[in-house]
Amino acid sequence: MDHHLQGTPAARREGRPTVSLIISTYNRPRALDRVLASVARQQEMPLQVLVADDGSGSETVQVVARWRERLGERLLHCWQPDEGFRLSAARNRAIREATGELIVFVDGDCLLRPDFVEAHQQVAERGFATAGNRVLLGQAVTADIEAGRQNPLDWSCLRWLMAWRRGDVNHALGLLRLPGQGWRRMSGRPWRHFKGCNMALWRDDIIRMNGFEEKIAGWGFEDTDLVLRWFNLGGRLKNGRFATTVLHLWHREAARDAAEENERRARLAGSRGATVAEQGLAQLADDDRPAPPGGI
């Protein structure tokens, strides 16, 4: 484990929203360990770090417990029993505990650059959700990262270009940052830009929409359902590219048996003007907060 904790206190800076960072995970403890290490290096620490756990076992519980020694009480483990792929429900459990003004969502296999939280704070604007982006890392370099043999967050620009030439990363300009805000405001309903591995919405907007639709189970399109309801509410997107980029560790593709039905359901909700999830935050029982096995 990295034994340093960087960043400024989580108190609200003038003009910047407080952030609750929600990290979704399921039985990938080594990846989660590296993600939490990247959280500890943030220049602007989030108010909260909430692990939205879809039923992981004891190894993940141990990872969270170890990092809580470094991150303190800001780190919360929001766990639910393993009853199949229920990402929407896992995220809703974390949203329920969130107190930050802005909620940033990432996957538990996405490394955060040191200015990630700060960049989301800077891009955030009322009336907009932020669509972040990702750089994909290859299988071999991912194995090295999870084993602690290298860390792409420490690479120089030259080393990054060499990694791209070798096929270890899929974007040569993955480290590039571009200033400005106006060009980030997207028009229309560009829902394909909104990816669950890196996105941000205002907490009060998510609550207005009743969170994620838990009727969408199995892999895929829970983020599409959310953003289409956001558009129906009158919301727009901002492009977080070249500011809020995450580094996405390699993994095998999940089973996509439910993808077709999930896409149909999400598109139907969008086309009929839905803004509120039928089964979401409001349907969570207040006392339904299961503890992880042997965890905190």
Model feature map: region roles:
Residues 17-20, 48, 225:
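Cell-envelope/extracellular polymer assembly enzymes that use nucleotide-activated donors
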Residues 107-111:
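The conserved acidic donor/metal-binding loop of glycosyltransferases
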Residues 103:
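Short aromatic/hydrophobic "clamp" motif used to bind/position activated sugar donors
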Residues 1-41:
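N-proximal low-complexity "stem/linker" segments adjacent to membrane-targeting elements
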Residues 36-84:
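Acidic donor-binding segment of Leloir-type glycosyltransferases
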Residues 115-164:
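Conserved donor NDP-sugar-binding/catalytic core segment of glycosyltransferases
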Residues 81-98, 115:
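Glycine-rich, basic loop-to-helix element that forms the pyrophosphate-binding segment
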Residues 193-210, 217-235, 241-242:
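A short, conserved alpha-helix in the catalytic core of glycosyltransferases
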